[in-house]
Amino acid sequence: MALMLSLMKGVTFHTRELKQDPKGLWRPALSPFGKRLSACVFGVVGLGRIGTAAVLRAKAFGMDVVMFDPYRENGAELSVGIRRVNSLEELFGQCDIVSLHLPLGETTEKLINLEVLSASKPGLVLINTARGPIVDLDDLYTALKENMIAACGVDVLPEEPANPEHPLIKAWAADEEWIDHRLLITPHSAFFTPESVYDMRFKGGEVAIKYLDGRGLDNCVNRQWVENPR
Protein backbone atom coordinates (compact mmCIF):
# COMPACT_ATOMS: atom_id res chain seq x y z
CA MET A 1 0.00 0.00 0.00
CA ALA A 2 2.79 2.42 0.87
CA LEU A 3 4.55 1.91 -2.47
CA MET A 4 1.26 2.32 -4.32
CA LEU A 5 0.38 5.52 -2.48
CA SER A 6 3.87 6.97 -2.92
CA LEU A 7 3.59 6.53 -6.68
CA MET A 8 -0.10 7.29 -7.22
CA LYS A 9 -0.13 10.36 -4.97
CA GLY A 10 3.29 11.65 -6.03
CA VAL A 11 4.80 11.65 -2.53
CA THR A 12 8.43 11.04 -3.48
CA PHE A 13 7.99 12.87 -6.79
CA HIS A 14 6.80 16.12 -5.21
CA THR A 15 9.39 15.91 -2.42
CA ARG A 16 12.25 15.74 -4.91
CA GLU A 17 10.79 18.41 -7.19
CA LEU A 18 10.19 20.85 -4.36
CA LYS A 19 13.75 20.43 -3.10
CA GLN A 20 14.93 21.74 -6.46
CA ASP A 21 12.56 24.71 -6.56
CA PRO A 22 10.21 25.09 -3.55
CA LYS A 23 8.40 28.04 -5.13
CA GLY A 24 8.37 27.41 -8.88
CA LEU A 25 7.48 23.71 -8.60
CA TRP A 26 4.65 24.21 -6.10
CA ARG A 27 2.29 22.71 -8.67
CA PRO A 28 0.13 19.71 -7.71
CA ALA A 29 -0.73 18.83 -11.31
CA LEU A 30 2.89 17.86 -12.07
CA SER A 31 2.54 14.37 -10.56
CA PRO A 32 2.84 11.89 -13.46
CA PHE A 33 0.68 9.13 -11.97
CA GLY A 34 -1.94 11.10 -10.06
CA LYS A 35 -5.33 9.44 -10.18
CA ARG A 36 -8.25 9.22 -7.78
CA LEU A 37 -7.93 5.84 -6.08
CA SER A 38 -11.67 5.21 -6.11
CA ALA A 39 -11.52 5.49 -9.91
CA CYS A 40 -8.84 2.79 -10.13
CA VAL A 41 -8.99 -0.96 -10.60
CA PHE A 42 -6.71 -2.77 -8.15
CA GLY A 43 -5.55 -6.27 -9.04
CA VAL A 44 -4.01 -8.90 -6.80
CA VAL A 45 -2.12 -11.97 -7.91
CA GLY A 46 -2.54 -14.46 -5.09
CA LEU A 47 -5.49 -14.42 -2.68
CA GLY A 48 -3.85 -15.93 0.37
CA ARG A 49 -3.58 -14.28 3.77
CA ILE A 50 -1.46 -11.35 2.63
CA GLY A 51 -3.31 -10.97 -0.66
CA THR A 52 -6.61 -10.87 1.20
CA ALA A 53 -5.23 -8.22 3.57
CA ALA A 54 -4.22 -6.13 0.54
CA VAL A 55 -7.69 -6.58 -0.97
CA LEU A 56 -9.40 -5.31 2.18
CA ARG A 57 -7.17 -2.24 2.29
CA ALA A 58 -7.76 -1.48 -1.39
CA LYS A 59 -11.50 -1.77 -0.85
CA ALA A 60 -11.22 0.69 2.03
CA PHE A 61 -9.93 3.21 -0.51
CA GLY A 62 -13.03 2.57 -2.61
CA MET A 63 -11.15 0.75 -5.35
CA ASP A 64 -12.65 -1.83 -7.68
CA VAL A 65 -10.70 -5.01 -6.86
CA VAL A 66 -9.96 -7.96 -9.12
CA MET A 67 -8.02 -11.13 -8.32
CA PHE A 68 -6.18 -13.90 -10.14
CA ASP A 69 -5.32 -17.09 -8.30
CA PRO A 70 -5.76 -20.43 -10.09
CA TYR A 71 -5.29 -22.32 -6.83
CA ARG A 72 -8.18 -20.75 -4.94
CA GLU A 73 -11.55 -22.46 -5.01
CA ASN A 74 -14.54 -21.09 -6.88
CA GLY A 75 -16.27 -18.43 -4.81
CA ALA A 76 -13.18 -17.34 -2.87
CA GLU A 77 -13.52 -13.92 -4.47
CA LEU A 78 -17.16 -13.64 -3.43
CA SER A 79 -16.28 -14.01 0.24
CA VAL A 80 -14.42 -10.68 0.11
CA GLY A 81 -16.68 -8.99 -2.45
CA ILE A 82 -14.33 -8.76 -5.40
CA ARG A 83 -14.18 -9.98 -9.01
CA ARG A 84 -12.12 -12.77 -10.51
CA VAL A 85 -10.32 -13.17 -13.84
CA ASN A 86 -8.91 -16.30 -15.43
CA SER A 87 -5.50 -15.20 -16.66
CA LEU A 88 -2.67 -12.85 -15.79
CA GLU A 89 -3.03 -11.12 -19.15
CA GLU A 90 -6.69 -10.42 -18.41
CA LEU A 91 -5.78 -9.02 -14.99
CA PHE A 92 -3.00 -6.78 -16.28
CA GLY A 93 -5.20 -5.66 -19.16
CA GLN A 94 -7.90 -4.14 -16.95
CA CYS A 95 -6.05 -2.94 -13.84
CA ASP A 96 -4.50 0.39 -12.95
CA ILE A 97 -2.46 -1.19 -10.16
CA VAL A 98 -1.36 -4.82 -9.83
CA SER A 99 0.05 -6.06 -6.52
CA LEU A 100 1.82 -9.43 -6.23
CA HIS A 101 1.15 -11.67 -3.22
CA LEU A 102 2.23 -15.19 -4.11
CA PRO A 103 4.97 -17.57 -3.00
CA LEU A 104 8.10 -18.30 -5.01
CA GLY A 105 8.30 -21.75 -6.55
CA GLU A 106 9.03 -23.56 -9.79
CA THR A 107 5.76 -22.39 -11.32
CA THR A 108 6.02 -18.76 -10.17
CA GLU A 109 9.66 -17.91 -10.92
CA LYS A 110 9.67 -15.23 -13.65
CA LEU A 111 5.89 -15.57 -13.81
CA ILE A 112 5.65 -11.85 -14.51
CA ASN A 113 7.47 -11.66 -17.81
CA LEU A 114 7.32 -9.65 -21.00
CA GLU A 115 4.31 -11.58 -22.30
CA VAL A 116 2.32 -10.56 -19.23
CA LEU A 117 3.69 -7.02 -18.97
CA SER A 118 3.01 -6.30 -22.64
CA ALA A 119 -0.69 -6.98 -21.99
CA SER A 120 -0.86 -4.15 -19.44
CA LYS A 121 -3.48 -1.44 -19.47
CA PRO A 122 -1.85 1.91 -20.36
CA GLY A 123 -0.55 3.58 -17.22
CA LEU A 124 -0.38 0.43 -15.09
CA VAL A 125 1.59 0.55 -11.84
CA LEU A 126 3.14 -2.74 -10.68
CA ILE A 127 3.87 -3.47 -7.01
CA ASN A 128 5.97 -6.43 -5.83
CA THR A 129 6.30 -7.08 -2.11
CA ALA A 130 6.25 -10.87 -2.52
CA ARG A 131 9.51 -12.40 -3.80
CA GLY A 132 11.96 -10.85 -6.24
CA PRO A 133 12.40 -13.73 -8.72
CA ILE A 134 8.64 -13.74 -9.45
CA VAL A 135 9.29 -10.77 -11.75
CA ASP A 136 11.76 -11.16 -14.61
CA LEU A 137 13.99 -8.14 -13.98
CA ASP A 138 15.24 -7.99 -17.57
CA ASP A 139 11.65 -7.95 -18.81
CA LEU A 140 10.70 -5.32 -16.22
CA TYR A 141 13.51 -3.15 -17.56
CA THR A 142 12.14 -3.53 -21.09
CA ALA A 143 8.56 -2.89 -20.00
CA LEU A 144 9.52 0.37 -18.28
CA LYS A 145 11.90 1.45 -21.03
CA GLU A 146 9.26 0.88 -23.72
CA ASN A 147 6.42 2.36 -21.62
CA MET A 148 4.45 -0.88 -21.42
CA ILE A 149 3.87 0.04 -17.78
CA ALA A 150 3.97 3.45 -16.16
CA ALA A 151 5.78 2.71 -12.93
CA CYS A 152 6.85 0.04 -10.49
CA GLY A 153 7.41 -0.22 -6.75
CA VAL A 154 9.44 -3.16 -5.47
CA ASP A 155 10.44 -4.21 -1.98
CA VAL A 156 12.12 -7.37 -3.27
CA LEU A 157 14.57 -8.18 -6.05
CA PRO A 158 15.86 -11.39 -7.65
CA GLU A 159 19.26 -10.58 -6.18
CA GLU A 160 19.49 -8.91 -2.78
CA PRO A 161 21.21 -6.58 -2.14
CA ALA A 162 20.53 -5.10 -5.56
CA ASN A 163 23.05 -5.80 -8.30
CA PRO A 164 24.38 -2.33 -9.22
CA GLU A 165 25.43 -3.61 -12.65
CA HIS A 166 21.96 -4.66 -13.77
CA PRO A 167 20.73 -2.20 -16.44
CA LEU A 168 17.54 -1.40 -14.52
CA ILE A 169 19.33 -0.76 -11.24
CA LYS A 170 22.05 1.21 -12.99
CA ALA A 171 19.52 3.46 -14.75
CA TRP A 172 17.56 3.95 -11.51
CA ALA A 173 20.67 4.79 -9.46
CA ALA A 174 21.85 7.26 -12.09
CA ASP A 175 18.45 9.01 -12.21
CA GLU A 176 18.32 8.54 -15.96
CA GLU A 177 15.56 10.72 -17.36
CA TRP A 178 13.45 7.89 -18.80
CA ILE A 179 13.11 6.16 -15.42
CA ASP A 180 13.12 9.17 -13.10
CA HIS A 181 10.21 8.93 -10.63
CA ARG A 182 9.00 5.68 -12.21
CA LEU A 183 10.74 3.12 -10.01
CA LEU A 184 10.67 2.89 -6.22
CA ILE A 185 12.94 0.37 -4.49
CA THR A 186 12.95 -0.45 -0.78
CA PRO A 187 15.32 -2.96 0.89
CA HIS A 188 12.92 -5.85 1.64
CA SER A 189 11.59 -3.72 4.47
CA ALA A 190 7.82 -3.81 3.88
CA PHE A 191 7.34 -6.13 6.86
CA PHE A 192 9.74 -4.41 9.20
CA THR A 193 8.61 -2.74 12.41
CA PRO A 194 9.62 -3.51 16.00
CA GLU A 195 6.18 -5.08 16.42
CA SER A 196 6.77 -7.37 13.42
CA VAL A 197 10.10 -8.56 14.79
CA TYR A 198 8.44 -9.33 18.12
CA ASP A 199 5.65 -11.26 16.38
CA MET A 200 8.15 -13.34 14.38
CA ARG A 201 10.05 -14.32 17.51
CA PHE A 202 6.93 -15.00 19.54
CA LYS A 203 5.20 -17.03 16.85
CA GLY A 204 8.41 -18.94 16.10
CA GLY A 205 8.61 -19.91 19.76
CA GLU A 206 4.96 -20.96 19.75
CA VAL A 207 5.48 -23.22 16.73
CA ALA A 208 8.58 -24.81 18.28
CA ILE A 209 6.89 -25.46 21.64
CA LYS A 210 3.84 -26.98 19.99
CA TYR A 211 6.01 -29.28 17.87
CA LEU A 212 8.16 -30.37 20.82
CA ASP A 213 4.99 -31.10 22.79
CA GLY A 214 3.92 -33.49 20.03
CA ARG A 215 1.01 -31.33 18.87
CA GLY A 216 2.03 -31.10 15.22
CA LEU A 217 4.11 -28.75 13.11
CA ASP A 218 2.41 -25.56 11.91
CA ASN A 219 3.37 -23.54 8.84
CA CYS A 220 5.79 -26.16 7.51
CA VAL A 221 6.80 -25.42 3.92
CA ASN A 222 9.35 -28.24 3.52
CA ARG A 223 7.59 -31.18 5.13
CA GLN A 224 9.26 -33.60 2.72
CA TRP A 225 12.53 -32.96 4.56
CA VAL A 226 11.13 -33.42 8.06
CA GLU A 227 11.92 -36.95 9.26
CA ASN A 228 9.53 -36.88 12.18
CA PRO A 229 6.73 -34.34 11.69
CA ARG A 230 4.79 -35.93 14.58
For each feature predicted by the language model, list its residue ranges.
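Residues at the starts of beta-strands that form the adenosine-phosphate
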Residues: 41, 63-64
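Glycine-rich Rossmann-fold phosphate-binding loop(s) that bind the pyrophosphate
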Residues: 47-48
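Phosphate-binding beta-alpha-beta segment of Rossmann-like dinucleotide-binding domains, i.e.
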Residues: 1-41
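Short, flexible hinge/linker loops that cap or flank conserved catalytic cores
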Residues: 34-38, 59, 118-119, 177
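Rossmann-like dinucleotide-binding domain for NAD(H)/NADP(H)
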Residues: 123, 130-230
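Oxidoreductase and adenylate-handling cofactor-binding alpha/beta cores
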Residues: 1-16, 56-63, 202-215
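Rossmann-like adenosine-cofactor binding region
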Residues: 70-171
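N-terminal Rossmann-fold NAD(P) dinucleotide-binding loop
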Residues: 51-52
